[in-house]
Each structure stands twice: as structure tokens, then as C-alpha cells.
Amino acid sequence: MFGPFKLTSPVAGGLLWKIPWRMSTHQKTRQRERLRNVDQVIKQLTLGLHVQRCQDKGLTYQEAMESKKKYKPRSKSLRLLNKPSVFPKENQMSSKDKYWTFDKKAVGYRKGIHKVPKWTKISIRKAPKFF
């Protein structure tokens, strides 16, 4: 109770999490930058696969870059990443989707994305359908 061995909240209830309830402006800036970086990687992958398919057909790199028709990736997962309805770009997302995520246990069914474990390593872009 008193003295050198008094009870503290981490000792009493286990690990004390100290996550603020809102994201700082610096966290939001870095989150937007991460979203833009992912968009850039997807764009480069799509462009590289387009150039590869053009070169398979006998076109040069310059002709492939200047062609008006862009070939879509053959893999279904990459085609889905290019669809805005499935994986929107950073500038197409609302601020609610950038910084908040769906949580069925939360009061308003939303929680800050910074409370998701490993939130800097995953890309959460869409809320569930009809939400």
C-alpha cells in the first residue's frame, strides 16, 4: 500500500497501454505518404508488366511507353489492385477511410487506424460493404 512497495497501475492490471485516442498531424502525414508510396509501387508494377507484354509482342520500350493502349496485368490480384472500387488511391479516399477503420466492438463502429497492430505495415483502404 504505502512505502517503497506501493501498487502501481502496471503492476496491478498488467501492461498499461498508452495509445492516444487521436492521431497526431505527423502520424497522419506519414500515413498519407505511405499510401502514396503504395500507389506508386502499384503504378510501376502495372507499367512494367505492360512494357513486358509489349516487348513479348515485338515492340520496343519506347513504342510501349508511347502506345495509347495500356495492357492490363494478367494476374487477377494485380487487376483488382488497379480498380478504384476495390483498392482506391490515396487522393480518392476520404479522410475517414485514411485514418479510421471498421471495428465491430467500438461504439461508432470505427477506431483509429493507429490502434490496429502493425498499422504501418498493412494497407487498410476499404470499409466493409454498406458501411
Curated annotation (Swiss-Prot):
GO terms for biological process: mitochondrial translation. PANTHER family: 54S RIBOSOMAL PROTEIN L31, MITOCHONDRIAL, LARGE RIBOSOMAL SUBUNIT PROTEIN ML60. Residues 1-12 form a transit peptide. It comes from the Eukaryota. Component of the mitochondrial large ribosomal subunit (mt-LSU). Mature yeast 74S mitochondrial ribosomes consist of a small (37S) and a large (54S) subunit. The 37S small subunit contains a 15S ribosomal RNA (15S mt-rRNA) and 34 different proteins. The 54S large subunit contains a 21S rRNA (21S mt-rRNA) and 46 different proteins. The keyword ATP-binding does not apply. The keyword Disulfide bond does not apply. Coiled coil: none annotated. This is Large ribosomal subunit protein mL60. InterPro entries: Ribosomal_mL60. It comes from Saccharomyces cerevisiae (strain ATCC 204508 / S288c). It is found in: Mitochondrion. Present with 2100 molecules/cell in log phase SD medium. Belongs to the mitochondrion-specific ribosomal protein mL60 family. Component of the mitochondrial ribosome (mitoribosome), a dedicated translation machinery responsible for the synthesis of mitochondrial genome-encoded proteins, including at least some of the essential transmembrane subunits of the mitochondrial respiratory chain. The mitoribosomes are attached to the mitochondrial inner membrane and translation products are cotranslationally integrated into the membrane. GO terms for molecular function: structural constituent of ribosome. Keywords: Mitochondrion, Ribonucleoprotein, Ribosomal protein, Transit peptide. One of its GO terms (cellular component) is mitochondrial large ribosomal subunit. Its main location: mitochondrion.
